[in-house]
C-alpha cells in the first residue's frame, strides 16, 4: 500500500516520502496515528501544496523534544520510594508509568510511552540508568534512584 509520510518514521522515511508499506501497518498504525495518508492523486496534490507547513511542524516537534531532553538531563536524578525487603528486592516493581510520574512531578512532562526500560521493570533498590525516547531522533538518559521505604 502506497502512503505519504506526514512524520519522520525511523527505518521508513522522512516527511513527504512516498513509501510502500504493508496494508495492516498503514491501516492500523500509520493512518490512525496521523503519521501518514493514502497516496491518492488528491492527497499527493494536497501534500505538495502544504509541504512547507508539514516540514515546519516536524521541525518544531523536534525542537520541543530537544528542549525537553535538555530539561531531563538537567535533573541529573529522580528518587522513587518503594517498599522493599532486607536484601534490596522490591515488593512489586517500578514500571514506566512510575518513572514517568516521578519525572513529571520533578517538572518535566513525560509520558510512559517515552520511557525505555531495556531490562524490564526495576525490581531492586539502587541506581538505575533509564533511557527516554522523546522523538524519533531524540534520546536522553536519567539516573533513577530507587530507595526502600
Curated annotation (Swiss-Prot):
GO terms for cellular component: ribonucleoprotein complex; ribosome. SUPFAM superfamilies: L9 N-domain-like, Ribosomal protein L9 C-domain. Keywords: Ribonucleoprotein, Ribosomal protein, RNA-binding, rRNA-binding. GO terms for biological process: translation. It comes from Actinobacillus succinogenes (strain ATCC 55618 / DSM 22257 / CCUG 43843 / 130Z). It comes from the Bacteria. This is Large ribosomal subunit protein bL9. Pfam families: Ribosomal_L9_C (PF03948), Ribosomal_L9_N (PF01281).
Amino acid at each position: 500500500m502506497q502512503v505519504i509520510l506526514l512524520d519522520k518514521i525511523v527505518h521508513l522515511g522522512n516527511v513527504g516520502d512516498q513509501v510502500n508499506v504493508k496494508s495492516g501497518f498503514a491501516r492500523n498504525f500509520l493512518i490512525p496515528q496521523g503519521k501518514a495518508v493514502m497516496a491518492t492523486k488528491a492527497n499527493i496534490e494536497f501534500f505538495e501544496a502544504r509541504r512547507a507547513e508539514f516540514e515546519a511542524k516536524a521541525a518544531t516537534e523536534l525542537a520541543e523534544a530537544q528542549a525537553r531532553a535538555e530539561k531531563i538531563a538537567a535533573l541529573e536524578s529522580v528518587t522513587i520510594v518503594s517498599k522493599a525487603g532486607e536484601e534490596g528486592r522490591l515488593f512489586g516493581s517500578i514500571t514506566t508509568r512510575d518513572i514517568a510520574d516521578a519525572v513529571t512531578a520533578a517538572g518535566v512532562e513525560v509520558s510512559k510511552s517515552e520511557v525505555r526500560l531495556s531490562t524490564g521493570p526495576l525490581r531492586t533498590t539502587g541506581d538505575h540508568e533509564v533511557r527516554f525516547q522523546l522523538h524519533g531522533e531524540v534520546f536522553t538518559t536519567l539516573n533513577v534512584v530507587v530507595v526502600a521505604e
